[in-house]
């Protein structure tokens, strides 16, 4: 998963990826259920192994699913027998304890996880329907293993993190902090006369210098990246480090406070007036 770091490089993935991988992968605009349906019909549902997506897109900034989009994808997959795979690497245990599938009430057939589930250590995980997981060895014919699979240190850190999230339930507080950041940034951009689209999903944050709407990657590409570069440098000078790409989501952690959120939005208000 190259993520937003290569979003503007004009490459399909990475050198070393066989052409057949790209040839057998069809990319569809996020939030476009009609085109997805047309594409499946054109290819033939029996030729489509799976539909994989981030339930909340976090690799092009932050783009939220339109009302009914995820349910529409779920219905399409259920009707055709195509597997639905949620990439919950970012959203898993972050937007809710049960991830985006809990938050939006949509159950995929398979899910992938990383980041939060590792408790700061490198962990990747996947899971899903019992009949699919039963295909893995030793109960099934699909072999999946690795030298560091089930690494005890990483597993211990991950379990401790997930149990802590379960026991402390920080999600309402993180939701409130995200809303506070959105309100502060909307005020800051309005005062500076800057067109911006600002949103959050729990502790995931997104801002584009774009009047909106921003619901897919084509619209994301219309954001003012030159203004973002000036904003990034201004915020860095103010002592606030942001991801250096306009297409990176931001995140709040349980260590953030209302005071820190307010300091951030106050700094943004000053910087935006200086660089707009």
PLM feature segments, named:
Residues 179-182, 192-231:
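Conserved PLP-binding catalytic core of the aspartate aminotransferase-like
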Residues 63-95:
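Catalytic PLP-binding core of fold-type I/II PLP enzymes
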Residues 104-135, 150-157:
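Active-site PLP attachment segment
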Residues 1-49:
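PLP-dependent aspartate aminotransferase-fold enzymes
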Residues 122, 141-164, 197-199:
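PLP-dependent aminotransferase class I/II
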Residues 153-172, 211-215, 255-258:
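Amphipathic alpha-helix from the class-I
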Residues 166-168, 176, 234-276:
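PLP-dependent enzyme catalytic core of the Aspartate aminotransferase-like
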Residues 162-186, 218-225:
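Structural signature of PLP-dependent enzymes
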């Amino acid at each position: 998963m190259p993520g937003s770091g290569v979003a503007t490089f004009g490459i399909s993935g990475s050198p070393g990826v066989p052409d057949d991988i790209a040839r057998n992968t069809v990319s569809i605009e996020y939030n476009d259920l009609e085109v997805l349906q047309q594409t499946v019909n054109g290819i033939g549902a029996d030729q489509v192994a799976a539909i994989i997506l981030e339930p909340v897109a976090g690799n092009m900034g932050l783009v939220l699913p339109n009302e009914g989009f995820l349910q529409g994808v779920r219905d399409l997959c259920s009707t055709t027998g195509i597997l639905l795979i949620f990439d919950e690497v970012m959203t898993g245990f972050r937007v809710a304890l049960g991830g985006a599938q809990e938050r939006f009430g949509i159950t995929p057939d398979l899910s992938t996880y990383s980041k939060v589930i590792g408790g700061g250590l490198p962990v990747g995980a996947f899971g899903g329907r019992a009949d699919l997981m039963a295909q893995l060895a030793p109960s099934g014919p699909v072999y999946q293993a690795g030298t560091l699979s089930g690494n005890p240190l990483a597993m211990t850190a991950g379990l401790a993190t997930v149990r802590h999230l379960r026991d402390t339930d920080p999600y309402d507080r993180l939701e409130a902090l995200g809303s506070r950041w959105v309100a502060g940034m909307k005020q800051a951009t309005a005062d500076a006369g800057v067109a911006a689209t600002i949103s959050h999903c729990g502790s995931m944050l997104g801002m584009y210098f774009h009047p909106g709407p921003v619901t897919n990657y084509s619209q994301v590409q219309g954001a003012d990246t030159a203004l973002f570069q000036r904003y990034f440098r201004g915020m860095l000078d103010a002592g606030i480090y942001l991801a250096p790409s306009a297409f990176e989501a931001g995140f709040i952690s349980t260590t953030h406070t209302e005071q820190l959120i307010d300091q951030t939005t106050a700094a943004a208000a000053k910087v935006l007036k200086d660089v707009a």
